[in-house]
C-alpha cells in the first residue's frame, strides 16, 4: 500500500485541520480493543488502537491481527499503531507482520546521533511498506507498562532545532518532551511548556504521551498548540482492573468480561468527549 493511502495519516490530518485530537488507546487485551472500537462507533469518532511490542512477544501477533480485523470492520476510521517500538528488530518484524497502520520508531534511549541514524533507516523501511511513523525527539521521563524500562534515563526536553532534525529523517509525527511524563507525575505535579510545544508544531504533526492525568483544559491547550493524537493508558485500563478486583469469582466469567468491556467503553467515550473527536464521522 502506498503511503498516500495510509489511514492513520488521513485521520490525523483531519484532526489537525479541524482542531481536535484522535484518542489513541493503549490496549493489552481483546476487551480493550473491543471497548475502543465500540466507543468510537457509538460516538462517531476516529480512534487508534495502540499495542506495545509486548503484544507481539506475548501472543505472537495474534492480538495484532485481532486489532486489525476489529479496525477493518469498524464503521468509523480506526487504525492500529505499535507504540514505543525500541529495537530495529521489533520494528522490522512489526512492519512485515501486517496489521499495523503506523509504528513508533522509538530510539530515544540512544544518544542523539545514533537515534537520528536509526530513525532515518527505520522510517524508510516502514514507509516502503505503506506504514506511517512516529518518533520521540528528546526523551520523555518515566516508564510505562509493556515498554522496556527507561525510567532511569534522564528526561530531555525537545527543542525546535532538534525537531527539524527528526523531520529531516522523514518521520510523519513527533512525540515531543515538553514537561510531560510517562506514568506518575510525582510531587511537582503537571508542568508543561506550551510555548515549546507550539514552536515545535511549526515543523511537523504532534502527538502527546503521558496524558493520563490531564484535565480537559490541559487537553484543549495541547490541541490549540497543534497536538492531533493523544495516547491514553490508565484511563482505559484501570476500569478493567477495578471490575476484575470487585467481581472476579463472584459472577460468571462471561459476565465478568462483558462488564469489564462495558466499563472500558465508558472510559473511552469520556476521552472522546474531552478530546472533541465525537461526531466527526456521522
Predicted regions mapped to residue ranges:
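Alpha/beta enzyme core
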Residues: 6-17, 28-50, 54, 62-77, ...
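Glycine-rich phosphate/pyrophosphate-binding loop regions near the starts of catalytic domains
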Residues: 84
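Extended, intrinsically disordered, low-complexity segments
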Residues: 244-282
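Thr-Gly-centered strand-to-loop micro-motif
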Residues: 208-210
Amino acid at each position: 500500500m502506498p503511503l498516500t493511502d495510509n489511514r492513520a495519516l488521513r485521520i490525523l490530518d483531519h484532526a489537525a485541520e479541524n482542531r481536535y485530537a484522535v484518542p489513541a488507546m493503549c490496549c493489552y487485551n481483546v476487551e480493550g480493543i473491543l471497548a475502543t472500537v465500540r466507543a468510537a462507533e457509538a460516538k462517531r469518532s476516529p480512534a487508534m488502537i495502540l499495542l506495545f511490542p509486548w503484544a507481539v512477544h506475548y501472543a505472537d501477533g495474534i492480538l495484532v491481527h485481532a486489532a486489525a480485523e476489529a479496525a477493518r470492520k469498524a464503521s468509523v476510521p480506526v487504525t492500529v499503531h505499535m507504540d514505543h517500538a525500541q529495537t530495529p528488530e521489533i520494528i522490522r518484524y512489526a512492519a512485515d507482520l501486517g496489521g499495523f497502520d503506523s509504528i513508533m520508531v522509538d530510539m530515544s534511549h540512544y544518544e542523539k546521533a545514533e537515534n537520528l541514524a536509526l530513525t532515518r533507516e527505520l522510517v524508510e523501511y516502514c514507509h516502503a511498506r505503506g506504514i506511517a511513523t512516529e518518533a520521540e525527539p528528546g526523551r520523555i521521563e518515566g516508564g510505562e507498562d509493556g515498554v522496556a524500562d527507561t525510567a532511569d534515563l534522564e528526561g530531555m526536553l525537545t527543542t525546535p532545532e532538534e525537531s527539524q532534525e527528526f523531520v529531516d529523517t522523514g518521520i510523519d509525527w513527533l512525540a515531543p518532551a515538553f514537561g510531560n511524563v510517562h506514568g506518575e507525575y510525582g510531587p511537582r505535579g503537571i508542568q508543561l511548556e506550551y510555548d515549546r510545544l507550539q514552536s515545535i508544531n511549526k515543523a511537523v504533526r504532534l502527538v502527546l504521551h503521558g496524558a493520563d492525568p490531564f484535565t480537559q483544559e490541559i487537553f484543549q491547550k495541547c490541541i490549540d498548540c497543534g497536538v492531533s493524537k493523544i495516547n491514553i493508558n490508565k484511563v482505559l485500563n484501570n476500569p478493567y482492573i477495578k471490575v476484575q478486583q470487585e467481581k472476579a469469582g463472584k459472577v460468571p466469567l462471561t459476565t465478568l468480561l462483558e462488564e469489564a468491556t462495558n466499563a472500558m467503553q465508558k472510559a473511552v467515550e469520556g476521552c472522546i468527549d474531552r478530546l472533541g473527536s465525537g461526531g466527526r464521522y456521522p
